[in-house]
Amino acid sequence: MGFRSFLHRLTAPKFQRYVHGDQSLKMVFVINHELKMGKGKIAAQVGHAAVKATLKSGEARPELLDAWLSTGQKKICVKADDARLIEQIEQEAKQHNVLSSKIHDAGHTQIPAGSLTVLALGPDENEKLDALTGELKLF
């Protein structure tokens, strides 16, 4: 899907709201707490993850993206102790057919280049994402 098509789908009036069964949908951001990023840095990294996950979902699962966009775009941030745990969660997400998007920092400011900062999961059903991240504390 091209960028113009994606923008059109986001901004065009919806004549019919999509419903994904009886399931509520959300996107989860798993933040690497080990890096001790500042609040602004975290906000920027989560922003990158949100955009990347939304674009990926638009290509891979557009019906799920449409349902999420039309039902409030719920987003949750949780913290992981380190990059190893984030990688483990990503592998579990793949096994459960949950879309994931990793963000690695460019290294221009607070943290070393290539550091895994955030993992975005979804959008997907609450229950599927809770099974992957339900044990993590809210950020």
Residues covered by each model-derived region:
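Intrinsic disorder/low-complexity detector
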Residues: 1-37
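Short basic, glycine-rich beta-strand/loop surfaces that mediate nucleic-acid
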Residues: 2-7, 29-30, 69-81, 94-139
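Short amphipathic beta-strand starts and helix->beta connectors
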Residues: 14, 56-64, 98-106
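Glycine- and Gly-Pro-enriched alpha-helical subdomains that act as flexible
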Residues: 22-28, 32-60
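Conserved active-site and cofactor/substrate-binding residues in soluble primary-metabolism enzymes
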Residues: 41, 45, 81-84, 127
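Compact, glycine-rich, soluble single-domain proteins
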Residues: 47, 52-83, 95
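Short amphipathic alpha-helices within nucleic acid-binding modules
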Residues: 84-92
